[in-house]
Structure formats: structure tokens, C-alpha cells
Amino acid sequence: GYAIYDSVKDYYFGYYENNYETYAALTARHFNAQYHCTAKSGIGIMVSWFPMIMPEMYDRLDATDSTSKWDFSKYTPDVVVINLLQNDSWIVTMSDQPEFKHRFGTAAPTESEVIDAYKKFVQTIRDTYPKSQIICMLGNMDITKKGSPWPGYVDDAVKQLHDKKIFTFFSPYKDTYGHPKVREQKAMADGLIKFIDENIKW
């Protein structure tokens, strides 16, 4: 819910954020589903705006403590939604950004490296939840803008996994400034709800 309430500056301040009104929480409430969310504003699969990526964080109880591990046996979801890569898609073009240098050195990842990194993380989630249905989603920022290669990367990764219980869903590009606001989160939720109704058997 980064900047969900800030329609002017798109600021990161906490009082502009609210997970309760995000597409994920809205979707869970629609289905009266138990909601378990692992998220951090600015995080990516290969690179983030800070020195941690989702493959390093997803299994932590305390995101700031690498020794604090979540016990996955406590909860097994029927459906897992993975919505990542928006931050990667920006930072991989910023060779002067500190985290670019930290993760990649001087050369941006190739298309095959992006696909492999995404595929590896999805496989990790599959190994964690062997029976869950997984939706590989992209949100409605510029990652789904016409001409973006990133939906293709996700499609390729999922195809290579050969898993009939892993799906893709890409929200239509919102074509507005900044991060999704309340109305745009609702639009994402509506799309995801429709996709789940049409494709997921609970």
C-alpha cells in the first residue's frame, strides 16, 4: 500500500500507506479467506531499493533478523499470489544505483538471468507449498505498460516450470502517476477476483 493515500507527491511516509486497502487485502476479504501477507515497499527478486531481496526475506518472522525463521508448517494457503518485479524493472536500468552495483556489479542481468531468477523464486514457493495454487501476478504500474518485456519474462518462467497449478495474471496498466491509489487498488482487486473465480478451484 505504498503511497496509497498520497495523490500529489507519491511519498513513502507511513501515514500514506495502508495494507488494508490494497488489492491483496480486498481480494482476501471478498473470498472471506485467511490473509497472510509478506511484503515490503521497494523490494524485488533480484534487486531492491535497499540491501535485501525477497528471496532473503520471505521466510523470516522478523524481516530484519536473518536468524528469525517463520515455521511454514503453521499455515498452508490454498492460493499464493506472487506480485514482484516492479522494483527490479526500474533498478536494472540504473547502473549508478548502489544496489545495482551491489547485486550486479557493472552489467545488468540478461533476459535469461531475469527469467531464471524469477523461476527460481517461484520454484522455492512451490517447494514450500507443494499443494497450493500459485498466481504469478504483475501489478498495474508501468511493468504492464504496452511494450514492456516483463510480462513475457514471467510467462516464460512459468512455462518452463511445467506446473499446471501455477498461473499468470497481469493487471492492465493504470496509466497514471505514481503508485496505485485506493481506486486503482480496487481495480486490481476486481481483476484478480475475476481471475480467481474463472481459473482457481478452491
Feature locations, PLM:
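Surface-exposed acidic, glycine-flexible loop patches that form ligand/cofactor-binding
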Residues: 67-76, 123-128, 199-202
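Generic structural signal for well-ordered alpha-helices
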Residues: 118-123, 155
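Aromatic/hydrophobic pocket-lining residues that form the small-molecule binding cavity
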Residues: 114, 118, 185
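Histidine-centered active-site loop/cap adjacent to the catalytic His
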Residues: 177-202
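A short helix->loop->beta-strand "cap" motif at the edges of active sites that frequently abuts
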Residues: 129-134
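Short helix-capping segments at alpha-helix termini
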Residues: 159-164
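Short glycine-rich catalytic loops that host catalytic nucleophiles or stabilize transition states
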Residues: 169-174
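Conserved SGNH/GDSL esterase-like catalytic core that processes O-acyl groups on lipids
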Residues: 2-3, 8-107, 142-148, 152, ...
